[in-house]
């Protein structure tokens, strides 16, 4: 299913960029539909039920996008997923879509986890350091985890940089065990 997810995400990225839609808005609007789907068990059941007619599913989609003002291109994309019974893949497609847009635009997504909330100055410094390492502009999301003791864990794509005290202690323990 990964290749299907990638194909749909790439196709949507092509359409969004060729129509010069605001990328941030397109990602947000697609994620709004994903959130509605995840939060509503009834809606998930509708998308997954093959006995419900495509026309009914499209009518439900039109009601949803009408409530949140989703652009026609995003609405049409989800309609294609409905037509091909691929709506259950929407959360993965949306994530892949965001990754593809970031790749095409030269951005790297980073997730920074620290023991406490970081100041704006610390965030800027971290983003500059990540940008130097990955050679791209960085869009960072920040979260906290009190179990880290100190330091930070930075995830860029599938690469993890563990600068936490907890991680350092685990490395020391591993080295001592190997000796």
UniProtKB/Swiss-Prot annotation:
Domain of life of the organism encoding this protein? Bacteria
The record's section on InterPro entries has: ATP_synth_OSCP/delta_N_sf, ATPase_OSCP/dsu
Where does the signal peptide begin and end?
A: none
Q: Kindly give the SUPFAM superfamilies that the UniProt entry links to this protein.
A: N-terminal domain of the delta subunit of the F1F0-ATP synthase
The membrane topology of this protein is: Peripheral membrane protein
GO cellular component labels: plasma membrane; proton-transporting ATP synthase complex
Xref: Gene3D superfamilies:
N-terminal domain of the delta subunit of the F1F0-ATP synthase (1.10.520.20)
Assigned keywords, A-Z: ATP synthesis, Cell inner membrane, Cell membrane, CF(1), Hydrogen ion transport, Ion transport, Membrane, Transport
Record's keyword annotation contains Metal-binding: no
Q: Does the keyword Cell inner membrane apply?
A: yes
Q: Which GO terms describe its molecular function?
A: proton-transporting ATP synthase activity, rotational mechanism
Cellular localisation? Cell inner membrane
HAMAP family reported for this sequence: ATP_synth_delta_bact
The Swiss-Prot or TrEMBL record describes its family as follows:
Belongs to the ATPase delta chain family.
Oligomer and partners: F-type ATPases have 2 components, F(1) - the catalytic core - and F(0) - the membrane proton channel. F(1) has five subunits: alpha(3), beta(3), gamma(1), delta(1), epsilon(1). F(0) has three main subunits: a(1), b(2) and c(10-14). The alpha and beta chains form an alternating ring which encloses part of the gamma chain. F(1) is attached to F(0) by a central stalk formed by the gamma and epsilon chains, while a peripheral stalk is formed by the delta and b chains.
Q: What does this protein do?
A: F(1)F(0) ATP synthase produces ATP from ADP in the presence of a proton or sodium gradient. F-type ATPases consist of two structural domains, F(1) containing the extramembraneous catalytic core and F(0) containing the membrane proton channel, linked together by a central stalk and a peripheral stalk. During catalysis, ATP synthesis in the catalytic domain of F(1) is coupled via a rotary mechanism of the central stalk subunits to proton translocation.
User: Which named protein is this?
Assistant: ATP synthase subunit delta
Organism of provenance: Koribacter versatilis (strain Ellin345)
Q: Which gene encodes it?
A: atpH
């Amino acid at each position: 299913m990964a290749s299907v997810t990638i194909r749909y995400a790439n196709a949507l990225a092509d359409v969004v960029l060729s129509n010069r839609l605001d990328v941030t808005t397109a990602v947000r609007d697609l994620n709004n539909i994903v959130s509605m789907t995840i939060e509503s068990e009834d809606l998930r059941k509708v998308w997954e039920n093959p006995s419900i007619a495509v026309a009914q599913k499209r009518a439900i989609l039109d009601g949803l996008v009408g409530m949140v003002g989703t652009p026609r291109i995003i609405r049409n994309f989800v309609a294609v997923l409905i037509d091909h019974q691929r709506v259950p893949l929407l959360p993965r497609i949306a994530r892949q879509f965001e990754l593809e847009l970031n790749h095409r635009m030269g951005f790297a997504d980073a997730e920074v986890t620290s023991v406490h909330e970081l100041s704006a100055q610390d965030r800027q410094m971290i983003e500059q350091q990540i940008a130097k390492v990955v050679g791209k502009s960085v869009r960072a999301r920040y979260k906290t985890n009190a179990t880290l003791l100190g330091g930070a864990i930075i995830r860029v794509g599938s690469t993890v940089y563990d600068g936490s005290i907890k991680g350092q202690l685990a490395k020391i323990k591993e080295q001592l065990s190997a000796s």
